[in-house]
């Protein structure tokens, strides 16, 4: 990481001296040259090639109308990636990077008395709570219309609320084409995730399909909220009146894993909470799904969503922070949509796997503290 950090700073300096249209080519060439100097062995060379490919992909995927804006957003993204990698391998402190050091994750808030939900304090918590308020409003709106209109009513209400939440989150950024592009990308990706969730939902009637869809979104929001220590998202079973048996079994397994992880995280020191949450969540998912673990394609995506939502909390630039967060939420929704496809095979599995975490889950319900389980 020392080598990558040095190459990064040299490339950034070289790019600052050229015209906007030349910044990325100069940056890439300089970074590549400096990174490869002195490297030896297949592992080191392989790492350099992968990092170079990542840089190219990252730049191409950055949305901005002007070359300078595009390059600036690219640098922000790369800065956060390098800082994250540096932390992972105990490389030099983040303060050695050109951008401001990432703020520490907010201190853990002890569990509130029963019936009271602690206020959101971080930007991510405020964002997910706004989305959650929109979710509840959408559920309420859909409850008052005929079955055939429930999905359409829900989407109209929830889509507007979540899009507004992201727009407000990005409103503090400097105005410009890059910001407008960021908003458009965030909302369009989430809209696509919502549609995928509904398409994947199974139900014999429009109402049953709608209930399965809402359960998917509920659990996705709950997992992300738990990662960020947000307290207001109810379990899927409390959000809808009926969930098809197959879907409920899979969602119950994810929810059981969440409860175990929440309990473990609450008992850990503040600086270790996410590490403990992640490890416990992964282990509990394996335990609750038993021998079917390897065949559940949704599990890696769900685990990735948990990691990515946490990564958003240590990003400094809003454009990076909310893009990372949006990706996490999309992954969680997609994962739970894939879980629905696993519901039918899961229904044939005995209850033995689920009972593997049953005792821990029972204790977790009472002891999960700040997480509202």
Swiss-Prot record:
Keywords: Allergen, Signal. Coiled coil: none annotated. Gene3D superfamilies: Group V grass pollen allergen (1.20.120.320). It comes from the Eukaryota. Residues 1-28 form the signal peptide. InterPro entries: Poa_pIX/Phl_pVI, Pollen_allergen/Os. CDD domains: Allergen_V_VI (cd12805). Pollen. Belongs to the Poa p IX/Phl p VI allergen family. Its C-terminus might be membrane-associated. This is Pollen allergen KBG 31.
């Amino acid at each position: 990481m020392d080598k990558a950090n040095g190459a990064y700073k040299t490339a950034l300096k070289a790019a600052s001296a050229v015209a906007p249209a030349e910044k990325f080519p100069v940056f890439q060439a300089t970074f590549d040259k400096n990174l490869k100097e002195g490297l030896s062995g297949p592992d080191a060379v392989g790492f350099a090639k992968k990092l170079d490919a990542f840089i190219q992909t990252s730049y191409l995927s950055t949305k901005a109308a002007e070359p300078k804006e595009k390059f600036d957003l690219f640098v922000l993204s790369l800065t956060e990636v390098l800082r994250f990698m540096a932390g992972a391998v105990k490389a030099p402190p983040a303060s050695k990077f050109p951008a401001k050091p990432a703020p520490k994750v907010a201190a853990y808030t002890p569990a509130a008395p029963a019936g009271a939900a602690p206020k959101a304090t971080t930007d991510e918590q405020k964002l997910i709570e706004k989305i959650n308020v929109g979710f509840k409003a959408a559920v309420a709106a859909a409850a008052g219309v005929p079955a055939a209109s429930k999905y359409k009513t829900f989407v109209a209400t929830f889509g507007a609320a979540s899009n507004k939440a992201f727009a407000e989150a990005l409103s503090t950024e400097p105005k410009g084409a890059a910001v407008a592009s960021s908003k458009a990308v965030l909302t369009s990706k989430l809209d696509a995730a919502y549609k995928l969730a509904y398409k994947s939902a199974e139900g014999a009637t429009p109402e049953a399909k709608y209930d399965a869809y809402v359960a998917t979104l509920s659990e996705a929001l709950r997992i992300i909220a738990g990662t960020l220590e947000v307290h207001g998202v109810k379990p899927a079973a409390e959000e809808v009146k009926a969930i098809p048996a197959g879907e409920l079994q899979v969602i119950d397994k994810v929810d059981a894993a969440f409860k175990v992880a929440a309990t473990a995280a609450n008992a850990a020191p503040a600086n270790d909470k996410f590490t403990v949450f992640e490890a416990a969540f992964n282990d509990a998912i394996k335990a609750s799904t038993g021998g079917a673990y390897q065949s559940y394609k949704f599990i890696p995506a769900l685990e990735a969503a948990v990691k990515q939502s946490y990564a958003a909390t240590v990003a400094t630039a809003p454009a990076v922070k909310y893009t990372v967060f949006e990706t996490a939420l999309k992954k969680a929704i997609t994962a739970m949509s894939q879980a629905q496809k696993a519901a039918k095979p899961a229904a044939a599995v005995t209850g033995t796997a689920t009972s593997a975490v049953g005792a821990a889950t029972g204790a977790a319900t009472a002891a999960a503290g700040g997480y509202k389980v």
